[in-house]
Amino acid sequence: NPSKFFWKIMETFQARSIKDLPMTYRAVGSSTGQKEFSQQADGDYSTGLNDFGAGDIPMSASRYTGIQNAGREMVHVPFCMGAIALFHSVPADEVGTAGLKLSPCVLAKIFSGQITTWDDASIMADNPDLNVPAGTKIQVGHRRLGSSSTGGTTGYLQAKCPNDWKMVGTGVAMGTGSSITWPTLANFHEVEGSPGMTAHIADKSYAIGYLDAGHGHQRLFSEVMLKNEDAVWLTSKMAMAAVDAYGNNGVAAAGKAAVDAGDIPTDVKADWSQVNLYGKAGANTWPIVLVSYIYLNKDMSGLSADKAGLIKAFVDYVTGTKGQAMLADFSFNMIPAAMNQWTNTWTNVITKPGAVTNFVFEESTDPWNGQAETVISAKRNSYSMWKLGELDLALTSVMGRLTSLESSLNDYGIVPLHGSGTTNPKNWFGKAMVLMEER
């Protein structure tokens, strides 16, 4: 999910450095990211394939144990928080103005195959205005490979409704995790990655699926309203727009609640597999919040000075003021200060090589020093990154003007008219419409 955030930082580093800084990040999902950081082949934990891993879930208990048993240690570096949301494609005129409300137990029954139609009595109880054709099947989307969004959704359903989170027909617990066994009913659809889930919701009528909120918001999908711990119905967009007495929106509030409750380990080398931010209290708190982590080896003594220094510079930027400020552009939240332990982790926990290249950041012009090859300078850039920034600004301006124009159509007597039907008079209708618009 934070792949675009990482890519932007990596490209920024490369554009702003004299030194060649080859950096890549492969967006393959949290589960695969954990596998490739922890192992070089299935079951071989002697080393991993990557210099770092990242995921929106803590390292699983089994992989953490595998790393430990191989004589290695790892650390978790929290760097952002995000919401997992449920989106649907029920036509707006059939949902009604109040929005589609699905309680945790109803969702548990939908995703376990016990509820299969949109007009089920349990759904109608919270949605009296819902007016779908009788017997309309719910087209359920679920991820094929391991994913943090699966982990977040299943963890939430298990935490809130364990008695209903059971496989249809067998009554066996569905379980939790980044990958589980799903029902094989005809209305269940296996998708690959966030793009696959996005296509499922966009292309199938009467579909439901789970995504990180940012993906759904960008596509303007209709969002399911969930009931949070304070019994308030809301969407993730509503939660993100709300601000509590501490200045936190509904996602950040979940992080603060977890810190205040002592749910976040103070030992970055510990097993974090049970850490979650499901169902935290607060009127505007979103109930399915994930923390994103960078996974690092504790022992970096075998790395070159440049590689160790580049890892430090990258994580410095991600967890520092500049990187944290960028997160909102990707629909993520900054982590609470109490969770941001990177400086202490690098200084007191990581075993470093004898020499570490000290990459530094130049924000304001520093003559002579700014030209050093270990300086990542804001005064350098690439044309493509500059042009992209200009296009972003232009697009933001155009979208603002378009929104303003749409909202004021009626002020100018402009009335939209839409129709559909037989193809025979289409040319005649088209000519008449053009004449009316011109006159």
Give short role names for the model-derived ranges.
Residues 1-439:
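Flexible loop/hinge segments at secondary-structure junctions
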